[in-house]
Amino acid sequence: MLIDDTTMADASSELYEPVNQYKPVARNIGIVDGPFEYLTTAGVRLPLPFTTRMTVVRLGNGELFIHSPIAFDAALAKRLGAMGTVRHLVSPNQFHYAHIGEWSRAFPDAVTWASPRARKRAHSRGIDVRFDRDIGVEPPEEWRTEIDQIAVPGGIFGEMVFFHKESKTLILADTIINLELDKIRQPWRFAAKLTGMYYPRGQIFFGMRLPLFLQKRKTRAAVQKMLSWQPERIILSHGRWFDSNASETLQRTFGWAL
């Protein structure tokens, strides 16, 4: 069975609401917008809410690849279970892993994938999550024919970027942020305007900029690889995703590295 692609998610009207509902993006790939999360420092929750989003890819064998799982929701889990076998729970960077434990307890046969540094960070923060495998430079056998990947440098914010070949969709977590100013409150709104991380152009996450610049050669190689895939759209974890002109967006955002 293929994921239904008759009612596609609209990047403008369905970006946030409804939450915890699967929204097809293209054949065999969709998104789920999640509830607000809050930044925490030293165990203290800061009044800085941000939106969340996970991406779901249905592989040819019926298994589901879930990128950056949002907070667990039983009804959503049931819906996904009906679409395919929840098999791969993927952490794209060391900050997008917190809910993998919840999903793995609901789907104990799923394989949990750790991005670089995710194991250490989870342990240091006392997060209850079991990681089965580590994500390497090359895509593993489990999805290499359908999903490609590349490591994007960024210091502690570095992440694994994925590409769904069938739909020509680039899947990002934090590398690019594209916040809609009318959907966020202060001080996020001020920060977004100050750093350029807002719709319609978006921008590289500010925490990655200096590390990317200092590793310009690796950055160039990663961007050239992404451009070689000729992506048509870019799904982001935070803010409005780009439903068209993906290559142009990459060239505009990373032009300084090319």
Q: Which sequence ranges carry the predicted segments?
A:
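Active-site HxH/HxHxD metal-binding segment of metal-dependent hydrolases
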Residues: 77-141
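Metallo-beta-lactamase
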Residues: 24, 116-159, 165, 214, ...
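Conserved, surface-exposed functional patches that form binding/active-site neighborhoods
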Residues: 153-154, 160-201
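Zn-dependent metallo-beta-lactamase
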Residues: 2-60
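Active-site-proximal beta-strand elements of phosphoester/diester hydrolases
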Residues: 31-34, 66-68, 148-151, 170-173
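Short beta-strand scaffold segments in enzyme catalytic cores
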Residues: 54-58, 159-164
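Cap/insert and terminal regions of metallo-dependent hydrolase folds
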Residues: 39, 47, 71, 83, ...
